[in-house]
């Protein structure tokens, strides 16, 4: 689909369809009022008749409105004007795109980007409209023998902005939105892949493919033999029960003209399937453990978006691929592992495996002398209990970095919330036999997991994002969400000095 931005009056638009908002109860938006005036009250007369109340998501398609050059006008219910928020705005955009496709529109000029959304500017509204549109059109049906027919005639969508001086901001928003949407799609596709296809070797193949597609990207794959030489015993232990080889994919993007500029490092947990190992998970819902690699998938999607945007920064993405299976060679509760850092860990539960993979990955990235390191992982069920399915958790050893990430989450509407990491929580990780245990009990489970990782991130500024509650959805809408790609790309946009606010 082609996106563009323009600034013009609705009555002068020669398009297949004009999209304008109507507020509850039956109140025309300023743009709809202009059309109503041109049509001698035609639209307001329909509202008085009760054809549209203006409730969120209501749609009314009008044909041949008097005085209007466009063939059709789509009236979109936007709810109460003062209550139009971010979530409702994005839902309205998606419903609008769905209606345009269902009604056969090939092109449309959308004036919904002129609506007032609390605390948001033109850049945000246009970018979110692009992201919401692409996300709403996403499907994953490549494994269906008969592909469902979908009617999608819409080929061109123009977003109108109030003034000509906002055109450049709107164009930038489209560029950013398309790159982010591409990264989100890549992340969702990886997450939704079945685990008999998407194993660690598949992650590595996708990393290589990214390097083939973009000159600014190079890839290195580290297999078990090299991990053995590096002393990544903890990482290797997790994958011992699986016949699929553990592989760590290093994706390097160089965009900074200063070759000595320190890189930002993103590390993604890539458990392509997590059975729990010897500490086997319950059978119900275990199929969703294919999503335990969504941290790696989001890092991959972020690297793809970054390459598309060609930002002037250096970033390294690490996909820590592994599979946790029970087997005669699997690691056990009671085992003591010597990590790459030299610290020892007593395994109390083999289903707390993500941190055992990440700890060695965090030690490995020390060699890059990073500006900062951000790891992303579906790490703890405790985070779902703490924050639900709407907000990701952030823990960090560096206040400015934590602030940057939370700020980026607010800017992108891919929300995160910082959790504490006080010294007292480290007490729960004590072991009588090793330097630490791999779990600290049920209380504060997300925090103690963060405390565990922090022991391997002492040589750089570090943050951890727990996406256990936000990486995928269950039920009828089951599937990967692609989060937190939007947040991570916003963080990188900010780091590269890109202005994304008026």
From Swiss-Prot:
<feature type="binding site">
    <location>
        <position position="353"/>
    </location>
    <ligand>
        <name>Mn(2+) 2</name>
    </ligand>
</feature>
<feature type="binding site">
    <location>
        <position position="274"/>
    </location>
    <ligand>
        <name>Mn(2+) 1</name>
    </ligand>
</feature>
<keyword id="KW-0378">Hydrolase</keyword>
<keyword id="KW-0031">Aminopeptidase</keyword>
<dbReference type="Pfam" id="PF02789">
    <property type="entry name" value="Peptidase_M17_N"/>
</dbReference>
<comment type="similarity">
    <text>Belongs to the peptidase M17 family.</text>
</comment>
<keyword id="KW-0963">Cytoplasm</keyword>
<dbReference type="GO" id="GO:0005737">
    <property type="term" value="C:cytoplasm"/>
</dbReference>
<keyword id="KW-0645">Protease</keyword>
<comment type="function">
    <text>Presumably involved in the processing and regular turnover of intracellular proteins. Catalyzes the removal of unsubstituted N-terminal amino acids from various peptides.</text>
</comment>
<feature type="binding site">
    <location>
        <position position="351"/>
    </location>
    <ligand>
        <name>Mn(2+) 1</name>
    </ligand>
</feature>
<keyword id="KW-0479">Metal-binding</keyword>
<dbReference type="Pfam" id="PF00883">
    <property type="entry name" value="Peptidase_M17"/>
</dbReference>
<feature type="binding site">
    <location>
        <position position="274"/>
    </location>
    <ligand>
        <name>Mn(2+) 2</name>
    </ligand>
</feature>
<dbReference type="InterPro" id="IPR008283">
    <property type="entry name" value="Peptidase_M17_N"/>
</dbReference>
<feature type="binding site">
    <location>
        <position position="292"/>
    </location>
    <ligand>
        <name>Mn(2+) 2</name>
    </ligand>
</feature>
<protein>
    <recommendedName>
        <fullName>Probable cytosol aminopeptidase</fullName>
        <ecNumber>3.4.11.1</ecNumber>
        <ecNumber>3.4.11.10</ecNumber>
    </recommendedName>
</protein>
<feature type="binding site">
    <location>
        <position position="269"/>
    </location>
    <ligand>
        <name>Mn(2+) 2</name>
    </ligand>
</feature>
<feature type="active site">
    <location>
        <position position="355"/>
    </location>
</feature>
<dbReference type="InterPro" id="IPR023042">
    <property type="entry name" value="Peptidase_M17_leu_NH2_pept"/>
</dbReference>
<dbReference type="InterPro" id="IPR011356">
    <property type="entry name" value="Leucine_aapep/pepB"/>
</dbReference>
<dbReference type="GO" id="GO:0030145">
    <property type="term" value="F:manganese ion binding"/>
</dbReference>
<dbReference type="GO" id="GO:0070006">
    <property type="term" value="F:metalloaminopeptidase activity"/>
</dbReference>
<feature type="binding site">
    <location>
        <position position="353"/>
    </location>
    <ligand>
        <name>Mn(2+) 1</name>
    </ligand>
</feature>
<dbReference type="GO" id="GO:0006508">
    <property type="term" value="P:proteolysis"/>
</dbReference>
<keyword id="KW-0464">Manganese</keyword>
<feature type="active site">
    <location>
        <position position="281"/>
    </location>
</feature>
<dbReference type="InterPro" id="IPR000819">
    <property type="entry name" value="Peptidase_M17_C"/>
</dbReference>
<dbReference type="InterPro" id="IPR043472">
    <property type="entry name" value="Macro_dom-like"/>
</dbReference>
């Amino acid at each position: 689909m082609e996106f563009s931005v323009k600034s013009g009056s609705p009555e002068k638009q020669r398009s297949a369809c004009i999209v304008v908002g109507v507020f509850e109860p039956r109140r025309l938006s300023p743009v709809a009022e202009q059309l109503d005036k041109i049509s001698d009250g035609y639209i307001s007369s329909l509202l008085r008749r009760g054809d549209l109340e203006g409730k969120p998501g209501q749609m009314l398609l009008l044909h041949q409105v008097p005085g209007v050059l466009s063939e059709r006008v789509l009236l979109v219910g936007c709810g109460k004007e003062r209550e139009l928020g971010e979530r409702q705005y994005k839902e309205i955009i998606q419903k609008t795109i769905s209606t345009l496709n269902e009604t056969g529109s090939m092109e449309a000029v959308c004036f919904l980007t002129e609506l007032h959304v609390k605390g948001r500017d033109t850049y945000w509204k246009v970018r979110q409209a692009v992201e919401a549109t692409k996300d709403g059109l996403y499907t994953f049906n490549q494994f269906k023998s008969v592909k469902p027919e979908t009617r999608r005639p819409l080929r061109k969508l123009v977003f109108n902005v109030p003034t000509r001086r906002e055109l450049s901001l709107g164009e930038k928003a489209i560029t950013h939105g398309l790159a982010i949407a591409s990264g989100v799609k890549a992340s969702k596709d990886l997450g939704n892949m079945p685990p008999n296809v998407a194993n660690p070797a598949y992650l590595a193949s996708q990393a290589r493919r990214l390097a083939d597609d973009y000159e600014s990207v190079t890839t290195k794959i580290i297999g078990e033999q090299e991990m053995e030489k590096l002393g990544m015993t903890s990482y290797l232990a997790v994958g011992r029960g699986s016949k699929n080889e553990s592989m760590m994919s290093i994706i390097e993007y160089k965009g900074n003209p200063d070759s000595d500029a320190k890189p930002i490092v993103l590390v993604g947990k890539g458990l392509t399937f997590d059975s729990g190992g010897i500490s086997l998970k319950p059978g119900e819902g275990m199929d969703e453990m294919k999503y335990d690699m969504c941290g790696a998938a989001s890092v991959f999607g972020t690297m793809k978006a970054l390459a598309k945007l060609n930002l002037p920064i250096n970033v390294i993405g690490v996909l820590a691929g592994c599979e946790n299976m029970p087997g005669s060679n699997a690691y056990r509760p009671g085992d003591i592992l010597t990590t790459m850092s030299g610290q020892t860990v007593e395994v109390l539960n083999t289903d707390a495996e993500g941190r055992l993979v990440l700890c060695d990955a965090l030690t490995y990235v020390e060699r890059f002398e990073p500006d900062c390191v951000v790891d992303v992982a579906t790490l703890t069920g405790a985070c779902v209990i703490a924050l639900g399915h709407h907000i990701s958790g952030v823990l960090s050893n560096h206040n400015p970095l934590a602030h940057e990430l939370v700020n980026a989450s607010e800017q992108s509407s891919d929300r995160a919330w910082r959790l504490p990491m006080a010294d007292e929580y480290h007490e729960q990780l004590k072991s009588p036999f090793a330097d630490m245990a791999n779990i600290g009990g049920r209380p504060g489970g997300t925090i103690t997991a963060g405390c565990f990782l922090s022991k391997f991130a002492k040589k750089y500024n570090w943050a951890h994002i727990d996406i256990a509650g936000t990486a995928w959805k269950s039920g009828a809408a089951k599937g990967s969400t692609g989060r937190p790609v939007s947040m991570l790309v916003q963080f990188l946009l900010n780091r590269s000095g890109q202005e994304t606010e008026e």
